[in-house]
Amino acid sequence: MSGGNDSVLHRPVEAPLMEDGELSAVFTIRNSSGIHVRPAGTIVKLFEGEECEATLTYLGKTVNARSVMSILMLGASYNGEVAVHIKGPSASRVMQKLSEVFNSGFGEL
């Protein structure tokens, strides 16, 4: 293990895929405590005022990315990969924000 300093932090899925305002990407969880309440709240807050639908998928389970409780139910842990799918006019802006928070380890690195 490299202690969370991996050179590949954000791996787009097929580009990122852009079709009618749709984007998909895969992010690696870099903070050692995984996605707990604070990171889940950070993710949900990114969607405030944005026009898009979004899901997170971890270990085959897909949830609404606008719900803290749903995100917590994923149990996403350190070094896990979370697939993000966003659809809507704000998809590009929100994906950029998500990339920043995942790559910063939700401010816990």
Curated annotation (Swiss-Prot):
It comes from the Bacteria. Keywords: Cytoplasm, Phosphotransferase system, Sugar transport, Transport. The keyword Transmembrane does not apply. The active site is at 36 (pros-phosphohistidine intermediate). One of its GO terms (cellular component) is cytoplasm. Pfam families: PTS-HPr (PF00381). GO terms for biological process: phosphoenolpyruvate-dependent sugar phosphotransferase system. The keyword Cell cycle does not apply. Disulfide bonds: none annotated. InterPro entries: HPr, HPr-like, HPr-like_sf, PTS_HPr_Ser_P_site. Its main location: cytoplasm. It is found in: Cytoplasm. PROSITE patterns: PTS_HPR_DOM (PS51350), PTS_HPR_SER (PS00589). Residues 22-109 form the HPr domain. PANTHER family: PHOSPHOCARRIER PROTEIN HPR, PHOSPHOCARRIER PROTEIN NPR. General (non sugar-specific) component of the phosphoenolpyruvate-dependent sugar phosphotransferase system (sugar PTS). This major carbohydrate active-transport system catalyzes the phosphorylation of incoming sugar substrates concomitantly with their translocation across the cell membrane. The phosphoryl group from phosphoenolpyruvate (PEP) is transferred to the phosphoryl carrier protein HPr by enzyme I. Phospho-HPr then transfers it to the PTS EIIA domain. Belongs to the HPr family. This is Phosphocarrier protein HPr. The lineage of its organism: Bacteria, Pseudomonadati, Chlamydiota, Chlamydiia, Chlamydiales.
